[in-house]
Amino acid sequence: MERPLVTTAIPTLRDPQDRRLPRISPPCGLVFFGITGDLARKKLLPAIYDLANRGLLHPAFSLTGFARRDWSPQDFEEYVRASIEAHTRTGFNEGTWNQLRSGLRFVSGTFDDPEAYRRLADTVAELDRVRGTGGNHAFYLSIPPSYFPVVAKHLSDTGLNKRQGREWRRVIIEKPFGHDLESARELSDVISQIFDEQDVFRIDHYLGKETVQNIMAMRFANAMFEPLWKANYVDSVQITMAEDIGIGTRAGYYDGIGAARDIIQNHLLQLMALTAMEEPVHFTPEEIRVEKEKVLSAVRLPEDLAADTARGQYAGGWQGGDQVRGYLEEDGIPADSTTETFAAIKLFVDTRRWAGVPFYLRTGKRLGKRVTEIAVIFKRSAHVPFGNSALSESAQNALVIRVQPDEGLTLKLGAKVPGTSMQVRDVTMDFAYGHAFTEDSPEAYERLILDALVGSAPLFPHQREVEASWKILDPILSFWETQGQPEPYAPGTWGPQSAHDMLARDGRFWRLP
């Protein structure tokens, strides 16, 4: 593999006209638990470097890794550099690397080793003294939730959560935020004992994507959309997150979690809340959270969960030109596992704006393509003067917000087919970020890490949102536990037949992304 292009010039500060990330972090340190995991290696370390490469991290920024590895400082530097070189999106720059490297530290130890935390406390104090981090430190817990209590206890025992004066101490938590409502509350109790809620940042990386943030801009900055954004005109809303891959090497994490807990509880319900919420009074974290919480608290489950939910497991077979294994044949998966790799549910939002409008949410692995989108499907015209036979089969306008890949918007509408007779077919008008703007969109983790370091929280779910999401999902999960094995579906398709039947009973069908 060719090494990336390396430059040696010290990078200049960001372009003053770059208004996408207009803030620079204060002097601070970031302590990573789980620094050797895939997420840190492929996403988090490159995101930190790319922020530094764009001049968005203070020169005093420091990065401390905490792991069991018996690494020397040089070993850790080599690991961080290799991760950055393999996954940076802004190109490797020796000047940026040298600045970042001078703030790297590594503490070897296990999560339950008190002596390791004392060494960590000494390292943090040394960084304050020689690096100038100013007593400002964030602790990134990229670890399974089962380890949170022991890590939190040791952070408290060593005083690492304590701050003085205007210093700050924060904690950044990766999903899942619990396994159900009860465990989510227990997890919150553990964290809240040592950190204030305002200092807790729960990462949902989908909320850092440019298109997700554009939902609010599109709705509230354009007079043409908001008047139509209601039950009078909207037939239904479909929110899809599909992957075309299997679980890979994540069997230990995925089995027992499943598609609903992994994706619907956080990503899809957050997307639904942003789509359905009312305009906030002010564009502040608390005002946005309040409006999202109102949506989640207004969600109503369907009466017949057997008819209006669906779950499945991908089977083995051919996908594209490759023969792939089924979920039960994957390494580390029990032969009798009932964990779903596909989940679809129908929900209602009982507000004046959305009364009677179904929200269909679906997610799965080994589906037809990798795509995440929100499709707002409008009602058919009440009357057309040239007869229904002239219309295409669907004859419904739709506004599709593409979250990934190819971020942008698509508007589907009817247009006359050239010729003498009146025939109307569906056509699309497309907006793509990559074509409309010359700037690259920041990677989601860049935005979220910077937000956490500067203390801005509009894109981080509050504990109240987490609990509201589990209140929605728990009854569905409890019902599924009584239903035995999930329905198998062929790889490369769009899920089990029960998911298609769910919409067919309503006289609708899933949009093909």
Model-based region annotation:
Residues 1-173, 177-513:
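Secretory/organelle targeting and membrane-embedding segments
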